[in-house]
């Protein structure tokens, strides 16, 4: 945040010219507790400089005649950053934004400090949004697309503030100087935003996800007494998103207060929400909009749970490979019951898990 216009200079540390103005390298402290360190020429910023704002954010770059010009870096108080092009102190031109881990989360253009033109928003899970933003810089319009983590399959259509209202199945064929080119799948299905509630898992429970349908299928598990399992439809590299875990959204308190038998398909989404696939939706013939709940537990898993922002389901979990998997290989995850919380006979976990744990520990001791 640049509050320079609203502040009054309090102190100057450094060289002054004959008129008492900063000249050379100086530190200027403002009454707002903002601070600027950089080069001055007779009271105007000229050369490299950096603002330190009261909220912990910073802005650095090259100044000409008291205004930021060219490439500048704004670092947010949480450590994320915006690398942009400045013209007379305003963001105008190409820009990239990065999260606190240094991952690219935005690429596009700015005009007069507002996102402009065709922009890309990147999610940590590998998915992305692309389209021409509106006059407020929001991803709103009828030519916006969500692109799945494979960078190929997409849902193209109408979005409001980055949320899909209606998307048609499409293929991203090319990207030319940041501008994507899509081909709609002939007679392809249309998808709508369908975030679950505590009582409704989906308005179209038998409408499968196109990305997931290319990568996994359900069959009898190879694990003894495990029922159905989730299998790879195609060979996939490590770190590939394979499947999605949607469910009704209930509280941790509700889960903790009921019997283990009712928690066979629950997974924690965050500190407040648990995703649950209850009966009858645990049957593939009643619910196949997402299949992540079909993955069975293993103490030597080839996959892991991860968070995912889905264009249809909203914030959910996904199943991501931890190593390369072969076609028709069963996908397994570690269910992650807490071994430090013990009951009378072992960890606070269902009986089948305790039995598998005992057997696994026995093999490790051989």
UniProtKB/Swiss-Prot annotation:
PROSITE patterns: SAM_MT43_SET7, SET
One GO BP annotation of this record: peptidyl-lysine monomethylation
Origin superkingdom: Eukaryota
Site (Histone H3K4 binding): 245, 256, 266, 317, 335
Reactions performed catalytically: L-lysyl(4)-[histone H3] + S-adenosyl-L-methionine = N(6)-methyl-L-lysyl(4)-[histone H3] + S-adenosyl-L-homocysteine + H(+); L-lysyl-[protein] + S-adenosyl-L-methionine = N(6)-methyl-L-lysyl-[protein] + S-adenosyl-L-homocysteine + H(+)
Keyword Methyltransferase: yes
Residues bound to S-adenosyl-L-methionine: 226-228, 296-297
Domain SET: 214-336
Gene Ontology molecular function: histone H3K4 monomethyltransferase activity; histone methyltransferase activity; protein-lysine N-methyltransferase activity
One Gene Ontology cellular component annotation held by this UniProt entry: nucleus
Localisation per UniProt entry: Nucleus; Chromosome
InterPro entries in alphabetical order: Hist-Lys_N-MeTrfase_SETD7 (IPR017155), MORN (IPR003409), SET_dom (IPR001214), SET_dom_sf (IPR046341), SETD7_N (IPR054533), SETD7_SET (IPR044436)
Entry text on domains: The SET domain is necessary but not sufficient for histone methyltransferase activity.
Recorded family membership: Belongs to the class V-like SAM-binding methyltransferase superfamily. Histone-lysine methyltransferase family. SET7 subfamily.
Function, as annotated: Histone methyltransferase that specifically monomethylates 'Lys-4' of histone H3. H3 'Lys-4' methylation represents a specific tag for epigenetic transcriptional activation. Plays a central role in the transcriptional activation of genes. Also has methyltransferase activity toward non-histone proteins.
Protein name per Swiss-Prot or TrEMBL: Histone-lysine N-methyltransferase SETD7
């Amino acid at each position: 945040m640049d509050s320079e216009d609203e502040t009054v200079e309090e102190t100057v540390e450094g060289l002054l010219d004959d008129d008492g103005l900063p000249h050379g390298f100086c530190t200027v402290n403002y009454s707002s507790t903002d601070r600027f360190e950089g080069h001055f020429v007779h009271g105007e910023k000229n050369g490299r400089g950096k603002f330190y704002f009261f909220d912990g954010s910073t802005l650095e770059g090259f100044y000409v005649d008291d205004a930021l010009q060219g490439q500048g870096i704004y670092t947010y108080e949480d450590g994320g950053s915006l690398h942009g092009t400045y013209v007379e102190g305003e963001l105008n031109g190409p820009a990239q934004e990065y999260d606190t881990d240094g991952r690219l989360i935005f690429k596009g253009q700015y005009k007069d400090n507002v996102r402009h033109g065709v922009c890309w928003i990147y999610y940590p899970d590998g998915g992305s949004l692309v389209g021409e933003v509106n006059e407020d810089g929001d991803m709103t319009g009828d030519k916006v697309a969500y692109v799945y983590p494979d960078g190929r399959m997409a849902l193209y259509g109408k979005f409001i503030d980055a949320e899909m209202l209606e998307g048609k199945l499409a293929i991203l064929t090319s990207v030319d100087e940041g501008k994507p080119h899509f081909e709609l799948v002939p007679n392809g299905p249309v998808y709508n935003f369908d975030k679950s509630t505590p009582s409704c898992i989906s308005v179209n429970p038998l409408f499968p996800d196109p990305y997931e349908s290319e990568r996994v299928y359900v069959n009898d598990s190879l694990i003894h007494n495990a029922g159905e399992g989730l299998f790879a439809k195609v060979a996939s590299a490590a770190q590939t998103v394979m499947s999605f875990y949607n469910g009704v959204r209930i509280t941790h308190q509700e889960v903790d207060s009921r019997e283990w038998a009712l928690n066979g398909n629950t997974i924690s989404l965050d500190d407040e929400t648990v995703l649950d696939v209850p009966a009858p939706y645990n049957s593939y013939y009643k619910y196949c909009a997402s299949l992540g709940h079909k993955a069975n537990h293993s103490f030597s898993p080839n996959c892991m749970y991860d968070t995912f922002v889905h264009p249809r389901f909203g914030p959910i979990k996904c199943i991501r490979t931890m190593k390369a998997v072969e076609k028709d290989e069963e996908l397994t995850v570690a269910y992650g019951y807490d071994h430090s919380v013990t009951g009378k006979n072992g960890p606070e976990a269902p009986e089948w898990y305790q039995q598998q744990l005992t057997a696994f520990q026995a093999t490790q001791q051989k």
